[in-house]
Amino acid sequence: MMGTAHHNQTAGSALGVGVGDANDAVPGAGGGGYSDPDGGPISGVQRPPQVCWERFIQKKTIKVLLVDSDDSTRQVVSALLRHCMYEVIPAENGQQAWTYLEDMQNSIDLVLTEVVMPGVSGISLLSRIMNHNICKNIPVIMMSSNDAMGTVFKCLSKGAVDFLVKPIRKNELKNLWQHVWRRCHSSSGSGSESGIQTQKCAKSKSGDESNNNNGSNDDDDDDGVIMGLNARDGSDNGSGTQAQSSWTKRAVEIDSPQAMSPDQLADPPDSTCAQVIHLKSDICSNRWLPCTSNKNSKKQKETNDDFKGKDLEIGSPRNLNTAYQSSPNERSIKPTDRRNEYPLQNNSKEAAMENLEESSVRAADLIGSMAKNMDAQQAARAANAPNCSSKVPEGKDKNRDNIMPSLELSLKRSRSTGDGANAIQEEQRNVLRRSDLSAFTRYHTPVASNQGGTGFMGSCSLHDNSSEAMKTDSAYNMKSNSDAAPIKQGSNGSSNNNDMGSTTKNVVTKPSTNKERVMSPSAVKANGHTSAFHPAQHWTSPANTTGKEKTDEVANNAAKRAQPGEVQSNLVQHPRPILHYVHFDVSRENGGSGAPQCGSSNVFDPPVEGHAANYGVNGSNSGSNNGSNGQNGSTTAVNAERPNMEIANGTINKSGPGGGNGSGSGSGNDMYLKRFTQREHRVAAVIKFRQKRKERNFGKKVRYQSRKRLAEQRPRVRGQFVRQAVQDQQQQGGGREAAADR
C-alpha cells in the first residue's frame, strides 16, 4: 500500500497529466531534464536516462510486450518505447507472444499488439488473455492502421483498454504507463481507477445502517458534484469481493453549523470514499442524508434521527407522518420549517430556489407590492369620486370580487358608471397596466380623447334597464391608461353608461326589459346577417334571408322603445398593429310593427372585416359609427360599401330628445384611393412585365427554330458551310466527268 504522498503525486498524472506533457514526469523522455521529487523540473542538470517508476506504481520497470508481424514496424515502435523508458519484449506473432505470457517469470505489465497478424491474430490473442485467470489483469492495447468503427468496437468489447491508430505517435506511447497505474490501484484496493484522491472512511455505527448504505447506489450529481465513485468490473474493495463501492459517498455542507459526527457518516470497514469539495453548499443534496441549516439544531437533529433510523430499512413499516413518502429522497416539510431545514427533493435546483435568503425572497415578492399599491390607488380614487349610485346589485359585485383574485393576469377592464358626461369609476380591478412607453401606445389616439381598450366587449344597457347584463366568458378587456373617464367594456352587471370601443362588426343595444341572458358572440369574423341578440343566431351562414327579415323587425321595434339620445354599440377592435380604417354609411330608419322587447342594431351584408380606430363619447374621435334614428336613437349600419375603407376623425355627439348626429370626414377615402391606385399601378406593371417577357421568349424561340431550319438547309463541306454556287459548280463538274467516262 502506498502512502498519501504517493496518492497526491499520482492523482494529477492519472487525470490527464501525461508522462511526456512537459517532459517532467519521466526523466530522459525526449531528452528532457530531470524532475525533482516535488515534480518540478531542474533545468541544466543532465542525468542518465532513467525513470523512478516507484513514484507511480510499485514496480521499478514497466515491461511492454510488443507483438507485430512487420519487422520494420516492430523495430521502430520498440525504439520509441525504449526511448520512453519502457522495457520492451518483442514478439513476431501471436503464438510467440502467448508463450511469453505463459512464462510468469517475465512479469509482463502491458501488451501492445497488432490486430491483423498471420496465424494467431491480435483479437485471438486478446481473447486468450481475457480468458486466462492470471493474464486477464494485464492491460491489452490494440493497434492497427485500420481505424474502422467495427474493428475498434470489436477490440474494445473483447476487453482491450485502448486502441491506437498507426502511425503511432510518441506522446501516445509516453502515456501507456497510466493503464498500468490504474490496473495496479484497482486491484490493490488502495484507490480507484479514476485517480480521485481517496482516504479511509470511519467505521459504521450499526450493522443495519451499514447494510442499507452498502446496498444503495447514489447517483445524485445534478449540480456537477460527483457523489459516487464507481469502480470498474474488476475492482476489489479490499474484502475479497468485487463489487461497486459507490455507497460510501456523502455530501457534507461546508457552511453547516451542526457538525456531522463519524457515526452519522458511517461506512462499513475496509472501504474507501472520495473527498468531494462542494462549492455551493446550499445546492448540494443527498438522497439519504438530510442537509442542515443555522436554526433549531436540536429539533432538526431529532428529525434527522427519525429520518435516518430504521424506517429506511427496506420493507419496514413507517409511521403515519411519513407514510406518504414513496422514496427516501422525499420528505414532508411544514411551512414553518422552511427556514429550519432544507427540503429533500429530486430536483435540487428547485430546492435551491426555495432556500434563498430572506432578502431575496422579499425582493421577489413583486406582485404583492403591486397589489398593495393598486389597493391604495383604488382607495384614493374612491375617496375623490362623487357620490353616484349604480344600478348593479351589490351582491353580484361582492360575489364576483370573492371569486376573482386580487391581482388578475388577464385583460379585464375596470367598469365605470354614470349618465351623460359625468361618468365615474365604480370599481377598479387590480390588473397589470402597461406603461406609456409600450410599443402598443403608438396605435392609440392622443391623450385628449378617451381611449378605447383592445379586446372583445359585451353590450351595455339603456338608462332604464334593470335587467341582468350578459356575461361573456371570452370577453377580455384591457384597462385604459387615460385620465379621462374610462370606457366600460365587458361588464358583468347592468349599468347606465354607453360602452364604446372600436369595431367594424356589431352595433348593438342591450335588451331593455328582457331578463334572460344572451351570450355575446366571441368571434370577430361573423358572416351572418342576424341580429346580435336574436334567439336564432347563425353567425357562420353567409346568406340567411330569414334572419335578415327578423333583424329588420327587431331593429325597427328597438328604435321605438329605445330612450331618446341613447346610442349603444358593441365594438371590437381587430388586434392587428396596422390599422385599415373602415367607413360606414349610416342611415336613419324608422320603425315597423311590434316585436320582442329588445333593442338591437345590425350590420347587413356584405360582412365587413376591418380595423377601426379608437372611439370616444361626446368628443372628437375617430369613428363615425353611430347614426341616429331621429326620435329613438337606435342605429342601424347598412351596406358597408368597401371592405377596407377608412374612418378618420369621426364624432359621436349626443343631443337631447332629438337624437344623435353621426358624422365623419372623408380624409381617409383619399388615403384609400391613393393606396388602391398604387396597388393597381403595381399590378399593371407586373402584368406588363410578364407579357413582355413572354413575347421576348417567344421571339427568341421562333428565331432559334428558323435559324436551325436554315442551317439544316445550307450545304456543308467537311462540316463547314459553303455557298450555294460552289455546290452547284461541284455538281456540274461531277456530271461532266461522268459523261467523259462513258
Swiss-Prot record:
UniProt keyword terms in alphabetical order: Biological rhythms, Flowering, Nucleus, Phytochrome signaling pathway, Transcription, Transcription regulation, Two-component regulatory system
Stated induction or repression of this protein's expression: Expressed with a circadian rhythm showing a broad peak in the middle day under long day (LD) conditions.
Chain spans, region Disordered: 186-249, 290-346, 377-402, 478-517, 533-568, 590-671, 697-742
A GO cellular component annotation in the UniProt record: nucleus
An individual GO BP term: cytokinin-activated signaling pathway
Segments of skewed composition (Basic and acidic residues): 299-313, 331-341
Entry-linked PROSITE patterns: CCT, RESPONSE_REGULATORY
Principal subcellular localisation of the protein: nucleus
Polar residues bias (residue ranges): 236-248, 318-330, 503-512
Claim: Nucleus is one of the keywords in the record: yes
Domain spans labelled CCT: 682-724
Biased composition regions of type Basic residues, renumbered to the chain: 697-708
Glycosyltransferase recorded as keyword: no
Cell compartment(s), UniProt: Nucleus
Domain Response regulatory residues, every copy: 63-181
Matching Gene3D superfamilies: 3.40.50.2300
Bias (Gly residues): 656-667
Record-linked InterPro entries: ARR-like, CCT_domain, CheY-like_superfamily, Sig_transdc_resp-reg_receiver
Stretches with biased composition (Low complexity): 186-195, 490-502, 618-634, 719-731
Purpose of the protein: Probable transcription factor involved in the regulation of flowering time under long day (LD) conditions. Functions as a repressor of flowering. Controls flowering time by negatively regulating the expression of HD3A. Acts downstream of the phytochrome B to repress the expression of EHD1, an activator of the flowering promoter genes HD3A and RFT1. Controls photoperiodic flowering response. Seems to be one of the component of the circadian clock. Expression of several members of the ARR-like family is controlled by circadian rhythm.
Record family assignment: Belongs to the ARR-like family.
Stated name of the protein: Two-component response regulator-like PRR37
Organism: Oryza sativa subsp. japonica (Rice)
High-level lineage: Eukaryota, Viridiplantae, Streptophyta, Embryophyta, Tracheophyta
Gene name for this UniProt entry: PRR37
